[in-house]
Amino acid sequence: MSGIKTYIISNKDRRPDRYADVVEQFSNKTEFDVQITQCVFLDDNRRYGLWLSMMNCIADAKKNAYEKCILVEDDAYFTDYYNENTFLQYVNYCESVGYDILHGGIYGTSNPIRNAYNKGLWDIAWCWSTHFIVVYNKCYDKLLNYKFELHSDVADGVLNKLGLKRAVMYPFMVLQKDYGYTDITFHTVGHMAEMLRDTNKVFEVNLRTLN
């Protein structure tokens, strides 16, 4: 059986370190059918460039009638919690019950709700992060038809606005390597770790209330 169509959005010429790292991450994982996709680089509006890159992938997935696809940014890496069988179980479950998007990991959310049938999945109303998302075909058109606000929108903010049915795996199976910048922002090294600590605390608090 072939793997899930997986689009890795990267720019080999501008970011050879990130390109090499992310290719290595997927090198031995046959559950993914990897396609390297050239990112749309707009130096004056990187937010829009990322969105266009993502929509190019979604358009290709729709054209090829893929029931689902995975979008990956080139700073993504698999954590020690990643397990192929568990990952595929989550992906198939979310597809069977009508989710729009499944996140491999996030930075920032509030009030996640643990799934009653899959305790490693949590429903979320909003989050920050698009570095690894499973996108199901039921929301392809909603994403493709969205009119991106050039002066205010960011990709993860758009997903928050659209009211999609979303879940995240926790513990997180895929996170972002901190290069000191993302596709749309520059920041101090260590900022990602701080955001991750804060996000983990949100889940830890919710776990304590369940125990």
Segments predicted by a language model, with ranges:
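An acidic/histidine-cluster motif and surrounding catalytic segment
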Residues: 1-72, 76-211
